[in-house]
A protein has these predicted regions:
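Secondary-structure capping and boundary motifs in well-ordered enzyme cores
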Residues: 49-50, 62, 86, 119, ...
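An anionic, glycine-rich sequence signature occurring as long contiguous blocks
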Residues: 150, 167-170, 220-371, 447-498
């Protein structure tokens, strides 16, 4: 037992300090495994790469991207960079990041190079509120809550198979989403000088012949959800319809699909070929049919039971769109019987259970279906960015500092999307010589709950460069294991302050 009165013992004890570890090793391990740390280092150097990660860790840990809070937060934590930064210093750092020559090509090309050859990208954009004044990207636009606010646009490309964000671009807040797509993909092609990506996937908001003309003319490989009531889409469905009950058209479950090449008429008279991928789902058909006839039955019941004496003003049933499914009534509601127009009803229900995508390149219906089903990844990524790193608020006064902020958000988003991917994976462990499969940890706890469980983990530094773990619980080790890092809180980290 050491003599606590001994001066050397007292000196040793006074040199001991503990630092908060929490979930930071998970973030760092993900940054290494995804190649993010290497790509940041290649683009901006090791010191700046560590600064970028430390700021991203701050934003993820606190769910706040306020620059002025970093100084009061950074001390006593295991971080890749641990010196404090004033708000002004951080703003200058954001500026320096975007003034690095060719950083976009170097960094994004490095991220793209890590994608598999058959990767599919989802495109989406969002508008972010800002208080910035001297910024050409900031425009006044209508907010989701109504009214007008200053906004800047952010567009993102995210890989389906990897779940990784690979490219982002700012645009003025008042520019419509449709105007950013071709530009985004064109810039992506300019930056990407090696890898041919299978396609970019977009939602129904981008469906129009004008957009398809731009995509084809720019040689952009895209998949877009189709609007079903368009003539050339209906014609494609009619060509495919007899094949959608055949075994060769089966994709999975109750979904069947057929691809139909089409050459719709473009306004400029130029001939362009597109591919309509027509799908049929029995469960979708059943749901839509039940809902349709339930609405008709409810309407007929209201018509039959209508009592003019119990209401004032004109009867709203007389203006209902549902009347198109009936013969012309012989009298008023409550005083006549409705007769269904079966021809109109047949027209309405003919395409129940059908849905379509359109691509600018030939592809099998099955691979288009698989790729479009994965599109919700980008929507989840944006939601995570807004809730976990406050990406819905941009605190910057110039376009260069704003882009620097978005770069940090992009880094945080890369780590978070991989974190969420790991939360969805099953893991194996050996118990008494037998393999046991654990269900995904995301089935049991949220990201914030995982952070809370890891929040107590600390390291002790002895002032001589040596470290030792404070108590790490079995639960904390199991969380790390189920995230794919079984030894994360056993092996001593070789980074951070000592």
């Amino acid at each position: 037992t050491a003599d606590l009165t001994d001066p050397s013992t007292q000196t040793f004890l006074s040199s001991l300090s503990s630092i908060l570890v929490a979930e930071f090793p998970v973030y760092y391990a993900i940054a290494k495994e995804t190649g993010l740390l290497e790509d940041l280092t290649q683009t901006w150097g090791a010191d700046n790469a560590n600064k970028i990660l430390a700021i991203a860790f701050h934003w993820m840990h606190t769910s706040s991207n306020s620059a002025y809070l970093f100084k009061s937060w950074v001390n006593g934590k295991l971080l890749p960079y641990w010196d404090s930064m004033e708000s002004r210093e951080m703003t200058e750092f954001f500026r320096e990041l975007t003034e690095q020559p060719d950083w976009r090509k170097t960094f994004f090309n490095a991220r793209i190079a890590r994608l598999p050859e058959d990767e599919v990208l989802s495109y989406d954009s969002t508008r972010i509120a800002t208080e910035a004044v001297a910024n050409p990207y900031v425009q006044c636009g209508k907010g989701k809550e109504g009214g007008y606010q200053k906004q800047v646009g952010l567009a993102l490309l995210l890989g389906h198979k990897t779940g990784m964000p690979v490219f982002f671009r700012m645009f003025p807040g008042q520019i419509a989403d449709l105007s950013t797509v071709a530009d985004m993909l064109l810039r992506f092609d300019e930056i990407n000088d090696k890898k041919k990506i299978f396609a970019a996937v977009m939602d129904r908001g981008y469906f129009s012949l004008d957009n398809f003309a731009k995509f084809v003319d720019h040689d952009s490989r895209v998949i877009v959800a189709a609007t079903m009531d368009v003539k050339w889409i209906r014609e494609a469905i009619e060509k495919a319809i007899t094949s959608l009950w055949e075994a060769c058209s089966h994709i999975r479950g109750d979904v069947f699909g057929v691809t139909v090449p089409v050459k719709p008429k473009f306004e400029d008279g130029v001939e362009r070929e597109l591919w309509v991928h027509v799908f049929r789902s029995d469960s979708k058909s059943s749901t839509e049919t039940q809902a349709f006839f339930a609405d008709l039955e409810d309407f007929e019941s209201q018509w039959k039971d209508w009592d003019d004496d119990a209401h004032t003003g004109a009867c709203p049933l007389l203006n209902s769109r549902k009347l198109i499914y009936y013969r012309k009534p012989t009298g008023l509601p409550g005083k006549s019987t409705l007769e269904r127009d079966n021809e109109k009803i047949n027209e309405a229900i003919r395409y129940f259970g059908f849905f379509c995508d359109v691509s600018t390149m030939p592809a099998r219906a099955a691979e288009v279906y698989d790729n479009y089903c994965a599109r919700d990844l980008i929507e989840k990524a944006f939601r995570s960015g807004k809730s976990d790193v406050e990406m819905n608020v941009a605190r910057a006064h110039s376009d260069v500092t704003l882009e620097g902020r978005f770069l940090i958000s992009f880094v945080a988003l890369t780590i978070l999307t991989d974190f969420h991917r790991r939360m969805k994976q099953k893991t194996k462990r050996i118990v008494k010589g037998k393999a046991v499969v654990d269900r995904p940890i995301g089935d049991e706890m949220t990201l914030k709950e995982i952070r809370n469980y890891l929040a107590s983990i600390r390291l002790i530094n002895d002032g001589r460069g040596n470290r030792i773990w404070q108590k790490v619980t079995v639960r904390q080790h199991n969380i790390a294991r189920r995230l794919g890092f079984p030894d994360l809180y056993r092996e001593l980290p070789d980074w951070g302050p000592r």
